[in-house]
């Protein structure tokens, strides 16, 4: 027992020893008191700081426990390797290392605690933690389940700093205020979080959780999940607010460059640079999408007066409707021919009629995509960098279809274009039953089910673009096909073939070869209109691309053996010669 007015320096507690401190104890090392489990009242032993008692520079290690009772004070304690500190009094500047734990009970106050890797602070109902620095708890990734590292709050946590890999979990009865979260740190809100600042950090508001007055700065994001609520959130440049279906965010301030990611199944109300906006009851009005922002308009839901600016995306599901849409340079639209969308883009007016499946004037870029379903049609479509136009069997094109460098057009069936295709990007024949090919070797998985398709167009202008086609070189001599119907093929188009047959079984072609470009109804093809983008080989054969007098283009083996074949055929002879040399040498050595 350290009596009031008495000071004890240094010492070690082990094997259920007790130290009762009414005076002052400095530099103690405690290795007992937790033998029966963490924070259990059945434990005996350890250091007990009584009312008026003071402990400084204590080290609490494996199985050690320091108990700070009401009116007691502990300062500069280091807790590590499974040791623990139980507070009903005051603890100042505690450091938790490697499974060190601090339990702040009702009436207890922890100030300036630092929680390092695998440390854990539990702030129980009626407890208070202020100025905590959290460096652990999120090593498993954002919002992952690390239950017993970091900080868990059932009471109150104030002025907390959460650094990279740090996590604060606010339970149903918990309250956290004035929290600062840096990149790589996160806060999981099941109770209440007030005045949180996200400087690259993350805040997750779960069902029944409430976050008020959150400020989202660059690199930070607030995620409001189903049943969660946020109020007075401010989104600054390059910050992001995500509101899931069934989540609610009200009084939102979206500043220029801030991103909103949500759907018409959520509730989001606030202001942006255009004025007031709303997303509620399946309707959106006045939403601004930029810097990674996205609005999903779901089936039977609608949106109006949407601005899709640089880095923003508007996605409209089949049966959804979006009117008065403005898409600026850098914005993206995702839809199919079952959606209804109308507005303006950088090329002018555009529209999609979900009833007829007709689309006109689309500009697809920056991750934007449009799918033409069976019976639908896309007219005068421009596909820019990172844009994708997909056509199902029975979908069609009209007018001018322009593919820029970095653009893609995917064909999942036979497709007809009654106009012109200008290709500086990639056209790819595909179907959902065909696995992705190993294009670097121009070989797909053998014996895969394949349905070959045709792309028919009046005119094709190649601007250095590529058409990826599938072919079988193991006997069936079948392939996808480009048909020029009554027009012409000009410029330069690269043909890239993927062998979807047995790559080890190449067969010599017969007749003119495998027709891959078919000029019909008086169509013409320039002599240099097509070329192979890479060597095409199967079995012992190389295959070449040839233009005939009928303007069609064919793949032919022409008995052009691969360079390896002469080597293979000479190996047996070389082996026999080598055997003779060895035999002669052996005879000479033995004198036989």
State the predicted function of each range:
Residues 2, 8-13, 19-21, 25-30, ...:
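Fold-core signature of tandem repeat domains
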Residues 10, 131, 196, 269-272, ...:
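Extracellular beta-solenoid/beta-roll
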Residues 15, 34, 63, 82-83, ...:
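Short, solvent-exposed coil/turn segments at beta-strand boundaries
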Residues 33, 52, 82, 107, ...:
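Generic structural motif
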Residues 35-42, 139-150, 437-444:
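Intrinsically disordered, low-complexity Ser/Thr- and acidic-rich flexible linkers and loops
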Residues 139, 147, 273-275, 279, ...:
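Acidic, glycine/serine/threonine-rich low-complexity segments
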Residues 558-592:
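Outer membrane beta-barrel translocator domains of Type V secretion systems
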């Amino acid at each position: 027992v350290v009596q009031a007015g008495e000071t004890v320096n240094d010492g070690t507690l082990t094997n259920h020893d007790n130290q009762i401190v009414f005076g002052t104890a400095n530099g103690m090392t405690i290795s007992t008191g937790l033998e029966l489990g963490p924070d259990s009242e059945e434990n005996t032993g350890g250091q007990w700081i009584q009312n008026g008692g003071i402990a400084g520079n204590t080290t609490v290690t494996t199985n050690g426990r320091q108990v700070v009772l009401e009116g007691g004070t502990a300062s500069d304690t280091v807790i590590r390797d499974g040791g623990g500190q139980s507070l009903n009094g005051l603890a100042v500047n505690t450091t938790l290392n490697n499974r060190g734990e601090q339990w702040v009970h009702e009436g207890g106050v922890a100030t300036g605690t630092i929680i390092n890797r695998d440390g854990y602070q539990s702030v129980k109902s009626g407890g208070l933690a202020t100025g905590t620095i959290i460096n652990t708890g999120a090593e498993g990734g954002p919002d992952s389940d690390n239950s017993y590292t970091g900080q868990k709050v059932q009471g109150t946590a104030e002025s907390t700093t959460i650094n990279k890999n740090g996590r604060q979990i606010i339970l149903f009865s918990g309250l956290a205020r004035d929290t600062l979260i840096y990149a790589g740190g996160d806060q999981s809100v099941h109770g209440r979080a007030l005045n949180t600042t996200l400087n690259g950090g993350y805040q997750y508001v779960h069902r029944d959780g409430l976050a008020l007055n959150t400020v989202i700065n660059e690199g930070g994001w607030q995620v409001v999940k189903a049943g969660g609520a946020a109020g007075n959130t401010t989104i600054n440049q390059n910050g992001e607010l995500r509101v899931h279906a069934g989540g609610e965010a009200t009084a939102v301030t979206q500043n220029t460059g801030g991103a909103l990611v949500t759907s018409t199944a959520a509730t989001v109300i606030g202001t942006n640079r255009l004025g007031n906006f709303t997303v509620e009851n399946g309707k959106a009005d006045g939403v601004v999408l930029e810097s990674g922002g996205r609005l999903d308009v779901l089936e039977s839901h609608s949106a109006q007066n949407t601005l899709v600016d640089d880095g923003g995306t508007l996605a409209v599901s089949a049966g959804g409707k979006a009117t008065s849409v403005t898409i600026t340079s850098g914005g993206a639209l995702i839809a199919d021919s079952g959606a209804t969308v109308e507005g303006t883009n950088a090329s002018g007016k555009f529209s999609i009629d979900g009833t007829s499946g007709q689309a006109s004037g689309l500009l697809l870029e920056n991750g934007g995509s449009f799918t033409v379903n069976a019976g639908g049609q896309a007219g005068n479509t421009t596909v820019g960098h990172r844009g994708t136009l997909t056509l199902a069997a029975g979908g069609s094109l009209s007018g001018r279809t322009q593919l820029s460098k970095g653009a893609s057009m995917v064909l999942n069936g036979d497709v007809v274009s009654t106009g012109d295709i200008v290709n500086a990007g990639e056209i790819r024949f595909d179907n959902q039953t065909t696995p992705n090919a190993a294009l670097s070797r121009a070989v797909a998985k053998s014996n895969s089910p394949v349905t070959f398709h045709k792309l028919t167009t009046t005119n094709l202008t190649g601007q250095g673009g590529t058409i990826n086609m599938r072919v079988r070189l193991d006997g069936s001599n079948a392939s996808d096909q480009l048909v020029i119907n009554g027009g012409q093929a000009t410029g330069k188009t690269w043909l890239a073939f993927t062998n979807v047959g047995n790559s080890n079984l190449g067969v010599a072609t017969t007749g003119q070869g495998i027709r891959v470009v078919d000029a019909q109804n008086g169509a013409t093809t320039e002599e240099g209109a097509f070329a192979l983008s890479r060597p095409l080989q199967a079995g012992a054969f190389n295959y070449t691309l040839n233009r005939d007098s009928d303007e069609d283009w064919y793949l032919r083996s022409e008995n052009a053996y691969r360079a390896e074949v002469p080597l293979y055929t000479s190996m047996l002879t070389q082996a026999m010669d080598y055997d003779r040399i060895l035999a002669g040498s052996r005879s000479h050595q033995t004198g036989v």
